[in-house]
Regions:
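Arg/Lys-rich, positively charged N-terminal/basic patches that mediate binding to nucleic acids
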Residues: 1-41
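Small, basic N-terminal interaction modules of short regulatory proteins
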Residues: 1-2, 62, 84, 112
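Short, hydrophobic secondary-structure boundary micro-motifs
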Residues: 31, 53-57, 109
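Compact soluble domain cores
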Residues: 39-51
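Basic/aromatic recognition patch in beta-strand/loop cores that engages polyanionic ligands
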Residues: 48-90
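Enriched for short, Lys/Arg-rich terminal
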Residues: 72-120
C-alpha cells in the first residue's frame, strides 16, 4: 500500500527556513541539494512509514508521532522529520509531515509538541 504525503504549513516553513540558512551560510547550490535530498527522503515515507521508530518525544503528542532522521552527507547536519499516520475509510492513508527540526536543537518540550500539533 502506498501512502499519500502531506506537509503542514509549519513543515513547509521549516524547510524554507533551513534552505535560507544553507543558502546564506554556504550557497544556493548547497541549499538546493539539501532540499532535494530531504524531499527524496520524505517521498520514501510513502512506502513503509510505520517501519520507522516512534519519536522519543512521542509522549508529548496526542497522536503517535514517528521520526525520520535525514542527513545529506555523512558528516553533515542531521534533521529530524516528525510525522503522523492518518487513516480513514473515506481517504487514502496519509503520512502527515508535522515538523522538521535540526537534531542539534535543544530537546523538544511538551509545549512545543502541542504547538506543532495545533499547527496541523
Amino acid at each position: 500500500m502506498k501512502w499519500a504525503i502531506r506537509l503542514t504549513r509549519l513543515a513547509r516553513a521549516d524547510i524554507a527556513a533551513a534552505w535560507m540558512h544553507f543558502s546564506q551560510s554556504s550557497s544556493e547550490e548547497v541549499a538546493d541539494a539539501w532540499q532535494e535530498g530531504l524531499e527524496t527522503e520524505i517521498t520514501r515515507l510513502s512506502l513503509f512509514p510505520a517501519s520507522l521508530p516512534v519519536a522519543e518525544e512521542n509522549a508529548f503528542f496526542f497522536k503517535t508521532t514517528y521520526r525520520l532522521l535525514y542527513r545529506r552527507t555523512r558528516r553533515g547536519p542531521a534533521y529530524q522529520i516528525f510525522f503522523i499516520l492518518q487513516t480513514s475509510p473515506d481517504d487514502a492513508p496519509t503520512v502527515r509531515v508535522m515538523h522538521i527540526r535540526h537534531a542539534a536543537r535543544a530537546p523538544m518540550t511538551r509545549l512545543e509538541a502541542r504547538e506543532i500539533e495545533s499547527s496541523e
